[in-house]
Amino acid sequence: MAAKPGIPKGTRDFSPVEMAKRNYIFNTIRDVYHLYGFQQIETPSMEMLSTLMGKYGEEGDKLLFKIQNSGDYFSGITDEELLSRNAAKLASKFCEKGLRYDLTVPFARYVVMHRDEITFPFKRYQIQPVWRADRPQKGRYREFYQCDADVVGSDSLLNEVELMQIVDTVFTRFGIRVCIKINNRKILTGIAEIIGEADKIVDITVAIDKLDKIGLDNVNKELAEKGISEEAIAKLQPIILLSGTNTEKLATLKTVLSDSETGLKGVEESEFILNTLQTMGLKNEIELDLTLARGLNYYTGAIFEVKALDVQIGSITGGGRYDNLTGVFGMAGVSGVGISFGADRIFDVLNQLELYPKEAVNGTQLLFINFGEKEAAFSMGILSKARAAGIRAEIFPDAAKMKKQMSYANVKNIPFVAIVGENEMNEGKAMLKNMESGEQQLVTAEELIGALTK
């Protein structure tokens, strides 16, 4: 007996109903991006490892899916290297390419490669899958879609403001209540400076970014393991646990970071973004959260994260400013800021809260019953007119028993069935049945179209 087929952990198949829901998500996000003047691009699923490595920090590099070279890749490996069993070293010999970890780094590579064709500031969006060799769990997958929007070639903070408006608009359209969290890497840098651990900024941000997941005690333990002094850890506590309104937090930070020019610059930027957004009348809550660190190496200014308020799940959107990203590809001085919607987590949230609009997940609206060759030929004429009017319609392909065809309509939740037998053909009409109410009505093609498009 053949082994039952399976799929890799952390990946999923999607049924037609699930794809209808996913397309509702993608189309909603795409429509909002278009409202703000963003244009779509795509990049390859695989990138050179030299493009990807070193852009996500040590932890991110470990999560890259590497693609084994084709051909005789053992020919360049010595016996000594094989016997060493050094996985990282051997991988560098076997693999030159990797699956993309996110859409931001490939976008930076795209900008550098196509700089002569791009008009700046360049507002692009991209909706494609990414892959991470992570441990699968609820809300975390190894293959998932991101829906990114980025602006490069402008350092104006109005870009940050517009991206937050996009986030607010998208989740308002979905009907998901969210909290938009904002912070600034310059504030975090300033905090590292005033506690006397400026050179440990990456270790500090990686640790405090885990506060929600592992708790304060474990964050402090990790900080200590990274060589951060007890005194510095003690100074850090009241800062990362700072409470109050956004205005109160900013006022406190101005005092706390008074000796850090970088830190004060971060406060100034955050104040501008928050104050401007306040005049926009956002529908969702926005919060300055000093524990938001997003443990990635490339953010240099504002950073964002979005949490759903009515569902226990991780971040469903994130982003930030990454002024230095294109520099590693030989193109300095290009400032960029972007956001990324986690479509797969949004899918789960909409499912849990039952927020999908009925019209978004409905497939076929009308099924023509097939009684035989003559009846099918007559039905095809009405069917063509219905489709031309924008009605999603189909005909059962075989002249099967009526019970089987009606069962097909029920299973697929098709709301209307058109029955065309000899009597209907003689009158040039069809019997239209409402599958929910059971009501039947003899109608012309025009009346049928009117009933389904009103």
Curated annotation (Swiss-Prot):
Keywords: Aminoacyl-tRNA synthetase, ATP-binding, Cytoplasm, Ligase, Nucleotide-binding, Protein biosynthesis. Its main location: cytoplasm. Its EC number is 6.1.1.21. GO terms for biological process: histidyl-tRNA aminoacylation. It is found in: Cytoplasm. It catalyses: tRNA(His) + L-histidine + ATP = L-histidyl-tRNA(His) + AMP + diphosphate + H(+). One of its GO terms (cellular component) is cytoplasm. InterPro entries: aa-tRNA-synth_II (IPR006195), aa-tRNA-synth_II/BPL/LPL (IPR045864), Anticodon-bd (IPR004154), Anticodon-bd_dom_sf (IPR036621), His-tRNA-ligase (IPR015807), HisRS-like_core (IPR041715), HisRS/HisZ (IPR004516), HisRS_anticodon (IPR033656). Homodimer. Belongs to the class-II aminoacyl-tRNA synthetase family. This is Histidine--tRNA ligase.
